[in-house]
Design a protein with these regions (language model features):
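Short N-terminal secondary-structure initiator segments
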Residues: 1, 17-29, 105-119
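Acidic helix-start/capping segments at beta-turn-to-alpha-helix junctions
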Residues: 8-22, 88-89, 119-122
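Internal amphipathic alpha-helical segments of the cytochrome P450 catalytic fold
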Residues: 6, 49, 108-112
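Penicillin-recognizing serine hydrolase domain
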Residues: 33-34, 57-189
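Short, small-residue-rich loop/turn micro-motifs
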Residues: 13-15, 44, 75
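Conserved catalytic neighborhood of penicillin-recognizing serine enzymes
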Residues: 18-54, 129-146
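Active-site SXXK
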Residues: 1-11, 98
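Short alpha-helical scaffold segments that flank and stabilize functional sites
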Residues: 2, 43, 51-52, 74, ...
Length: 189
């Protein structure tokens, strides 16, 4: 969507308690979409990824539909998404499709900026969000343009990186690593 990235989002209605009908306090209230992108990309924050879809201008389901439409328009014909976090076991992709996704992601300045950050520290109201990038190569390798990590029991440790090297643009994809710790050594070359 072309939704504004720097507008603060009022998440009060999303945080309503079903029992008490009163809003629960949320550290994410008054966060911006840009900050949610940073949290989702740098810390692999699943709540942030989910909130990006929950605050999508046309609703959560349309967000998922648009994600699938976008990946298919990129030629990612073996990919399907059921949720924005990657945690749903029905989500599926392939290494060749993820190469296409990484290449397309390089056209989004917010994604590239977040991929370059080795550490995140932002303040939302009185709450600090901080943490290191889930890819420890960020900061030590300056050729990484796009990076995203993931892990589920079914998929194992996963990593996608787009690098601009002296030999040209390269994409590294690691799928099915035994743990989040082994995906990085498997990716280094």
């Amino acid at each position: 969507s072309k939704a504004p990235l720097d507008k603060q989002l009022d998440l009060t209605l999303l945080n309503m308690s079903k029992k008490s009908k009163k809003p629960k306090r949320s550290a994410y209230n008054n966060i911006t979409r840009r900050e949610l992108i940073q949290l989702a990309m740098i810390r692999s924050d699943n709540t942030a990824a989910r909130l990006l879809c929950q605050t999508y201008p046309m609703g959560f389901n349309r967000c998922i539909d648009d994600m699938n439409t976008k990946v298919h328009s990129l030629g990612m014909l073996n990919s399907v998404f059921y949720d924005p976090t990657g945690l749903d076991d029905r989500n599926n992709s392939t290494a060749s499709d993820l190469i296409k996704l990484a290449s397309a992601a390089a056209n989004y300045p917010e994604v590239v900026h977040a991929s370059h950050q080795s550490h995140l520290k932002i303040k939302i109201q009185r709450h600090w969000f901080s943490g290191n990038n889930t890819n420890p190569l960020i900061g030590s390798r300056h050729d990484i343009q796009v990076s995203k990590t993931g892990w589920t029991t079914k998929a194992g440790g996963c990593l996608v990186m787009l690098l601009d090297t002296d030999k040209g643009r390269r994409v590294v994809v690691v799928l099915g690593s035994k743990s989040t710790r082994t995906r990085i050594p498997e990716a280094e070359f």
